[in-house]
Amino acid sequence: HKEYRRQRQMCIRDRDLKAEVETVDVAGGYELPAALRMAMKARRRWDGYLLLGCVVKGETDHYTFICEAICKGVMDISVESGAPIGFGLLTVDSLAQAEARSRPDRMNKGAEAAHALVAQIALARGWGLA
């Protein structure tokens, strides 16, 4: 969470956005699409949604099914709703790979997803949609 919050603040500052952010934890990656749908149905409205997660491969094919289900669920909601969504799901073989893809000083897939979300929100605002 600490790195996520740092990246979020950088994105807001870089774009000079007036942003209010709420962080929600879910049980696991598989729950991301359902949590996204719930957030979109909530009384409170947000300009965009950032989903971050990590699935580490085990010894069975379960990993493949879970990753595909998460990605399909998020994509279906994205296409259906048209809402700005940043999506950073690490699909890795080990914790070391996850750490390498979430380093604050180099490659950071969460930061990339956050920057993509900020760009999508700016696009939606430019078209009067957010």
Task: Label every model-predicted segment.
Residues 107-130:
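A charged, well-structured terminal subsegment
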Residues 93-108:
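Phosphate-binding/catalytic loops
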Residues 26, 53-55, 90-95:
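Short, ordered loop/turn segments at secondary-structure junctions
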Residues 1-12:
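Single conserved hydrophobic/aromatic residue that forms the stacking wall/gate
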Residues 64-91:
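Short, acidic/small-residue loops that bind anionic groups at enzyme active sites
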Residues 34-74, 130:
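Glycine-rich phosphate-binding loop
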Residues 15-25:
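Short beta-strand elements in bilobed, periplasmic/extracellular small-molecule ligand-binding domains
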